[in-house]
Amino acid sequence: MKLSYFYVAADVPDGIIPESSVVIDVLRATTTIAWALENGADSVQVFADVDELKNQAKTFDSKEKILVGERGGKKLDGFDLGNSPLGVSPESVKGKRVFMSTTNGTRSLHRVRESKSLYTMALPNRKAIAERLKSDNPKEVWIVGSGWEGSYSLEDSLAAGALASLLMDQLESVQIVNDELMASVALWKNWENDVEGCLRIASHGQRLAGIGNHDDDFACCASLDNLSVIPKQIEMGVLRSN
């Protein structure tokens, strides 16, 4: 199994459809996706464009949908929830389609939407995704970070390194293909005993801290291997627990 890591959507090669892709946005889109599905959401549909999201959402009854979105870490006007994993409680999302648009994560999902198998991962469901990849046994896996407005993010690279490290520990056949992932594994080894500390010193972590008290979000996003949910794309742009 060959593993590659791309810091942001723009780094993903053109003209190639990977066998398997894993998209990461630790703070906070893929953590929110994992918790929404864990808490009983029927599905999560992701959009890079807010107007497209609103048009699609109009086709659903109000009782069958919930709108989740943020820009710059703040809830979008007219949306039900911002991009917090704590907001997608069972009372809010159970049985509903979550229509979601965020600053960074939804762009990366859009970029690799044609992958043969597409998953989303956060630190809470790292082990579950690793187990699924072991079961699928693809020849090649692209791990795609989300970054911040097109630039590198520490926390996504930490999670990429966490996934690769776990797979390397469990499979002799794993090959790390690029330096980006090798550096991410080293980053994980350095911070694996203080995951929340890494999230807090990251520039996006500092950005979140600067716009309000996000202590509970940090704790949730830093939790490791406590969810068994596996968000998988079942149709273009639509994720469901698989």
UniProtKB/Swiss-Prot annotation:
Q: Tell me its cofactors.
A: Mg(2+)
Please name the InterPro entries in this protein's record. ComB-like, ComB-like_sf
Q: Which UniProt keywords apply?
A: Hydrolase, Magnesium
Q: What is its EC number?
A: 3.1.3.71
Please give the Pfam families that the UniProt record associates with this protein: 2-ph_phosp (PF04029)
GO MF annotations for this entry? Answer: 2-phosphosulfolactate phosphatase activity; magnesium ion binding; sulfopyruvate decarboxylase activity
Against NCBIfam families, the record matches this protein to: PRK00886.1-2 (NF002053)
HAMAP family in the record, alphabetically? ComB
Protein name in the entry: Probable 2-phosphosulfolactate phosphatase
What is the organism of origin for this protein?
Answer: Prochlorococcus marinus (strain NATL2A)
